[in-house]
């Protein structure tokens, strides 16, 4: 007989991109219900303890959060397992630090440091545009937001620029060929490039062909793509590497060059 949601998560079953030690204990933090899927998020306890190293233990994280020191998207969060996800802005006012959660080219979450002006907004992918009671239009975003009376030109798969203080749409990007995107799912997760071609398949998934700034081409599904900006210029700063995935040979050459450059 089922008794509701599981309240625990074994460490071996935790997502690989959390990068937890296999021998660090039997259990991992089970993400709370929230705006992101449990396998596509990073709980606050892992951000504070494992990534930023502001705490050594689980209990230290709880005491930091209970002092209301950590904000996600401009709101104080005290839940230790709150699921922060892609594009979320994590702020610590006491240290004047702001981070945006992005993917690296290996598909792992990366805390990318931000300037103050960039921490005031986030980009949100539009999941659907619908009409509610009395014909009021509203849109749903990838992080569970519902925004009423959007611009009539905004459609599904477009990206909106959201002001985190007022929760209002400042601008939007159409999902078009020629715009820069980041892949948020599949084997190419974390790669950044420009949409070159869009293939429609009746009764199946739409395929996008993307080319990065180095000329590498790859394909992915439509649902795995998040538009970052108009043309080739993204609206948010990107982590080191700019979302370009090197081949094994290119990576080896880069490491050899770095080793030879460092004095013995």
From Swiss-Prot:
Keywords tagged on the record: Cytoplasm, Ribonucleoprotein, Ribosomal protein, RNA-binding, rRNA-binding
Keyword Ribosomal protein on entry: yes
An example of a Gene Ontology cellular component annotation for this protein is:
cytosolic small ribosomal subunit
Protein location = Cytoplasm
The cross-references to Pfam families, in alphabetical order and at most eight, read: 40S_S4_C (PF16121), KOW (PF00467), Ribosomal_S4e (PF00900), RS4NT (PF08071)
**Family matches, as CDD domains:** KOW_RPS4, S4
- Where in the numbering of this chain does the S4 RNA-binding domain appear? 42-104
The molecular function GO annotations come to: RNA binding; rRNA binding; structural constituent of ribosome
Query: Is Ribonucleoprotein found in the keyword set?
Result: yes
Indicate the principal place this protein occupies in or around the cell: cytoplasm
The protein's matches in InterPro entries, at most eight in alphabetical order, are given as: KOW, Rib_uL2_dom2, Ribosomal_eS4, Ribosomal_eS4_C, Ribosomal_eS4_central_region, Ribosomal_eS4_central_sf, Ribosomal_eS4_KOW, Ribosomal_eS4_N
**Which Gene Ontology BP annotations are present?**
translation
Q: Give the record's family classification.
A: Belongs to the eukaryotic ribosomal protein eS4 family.
Cite the HAMAP family for this sequence: Ribosomal_eS4
Protein name (record): Small ribosomal subunit protein eS4
**Organism of this sequence:** Solanum tuberosum (Potato)
Name the lineage. Answer: Eukaryota, Viridiplantae, Streptophyta, Embryophyta, Tracheophyta
């Amino acid at each position: 007989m089922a008794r509701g949601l599981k309240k625990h998560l074994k460490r071996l079953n935790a997502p690989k991109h959390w990068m937890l030690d296999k021998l660090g204990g039997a259990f991992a933090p089970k993400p709370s219900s929230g705006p992101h899927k449990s396998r596509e998020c990073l709980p606050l306890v892992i951000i504070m303890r494992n990534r930023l190293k502001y705490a050594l233990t689980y209990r230290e994280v709880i005491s930091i959060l209970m002092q209301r020191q950590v904000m996600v998207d401009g709101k104080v969060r005290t839940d230790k397992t709150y699921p922060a996800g892609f594009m979320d802005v994590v702020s610590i006012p006491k240290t004047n630090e702001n981070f945006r959660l992005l993917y690296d080219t290996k598909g792992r979450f990366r805390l990318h440091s931000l300037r103050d002006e960039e921490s005031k907004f986030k980009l949100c992918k539009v999941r659907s545009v619908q009409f509610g009671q009395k014909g009021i239009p509203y849109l749903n975003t990838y992080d569970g937001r519902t925004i009423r009376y959007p611009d009539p030109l905004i459609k599904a798969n477009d990206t909106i620029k959201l002001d985190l203080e007022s929760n209002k749409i400042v601008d939007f990007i159409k999902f078009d060929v020629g715009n820069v995107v980041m892949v948020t799912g599949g084997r190419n997760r974390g790669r950044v490039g420009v949409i070159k071609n869009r293939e429609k398949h009746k009764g199946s998934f739409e395929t996008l062909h993307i080319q990065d700034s180095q000329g590498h081409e790859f394909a992915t599904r439509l649902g795995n793509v998040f538009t970052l900006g108009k043309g080739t210029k993204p609206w948010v700063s990107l982590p080191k590497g700019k979302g370009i995935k090197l081949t094994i040979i290119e990576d080896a050459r880069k490491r050899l060059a770095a080793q030879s450059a460092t004095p013995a």
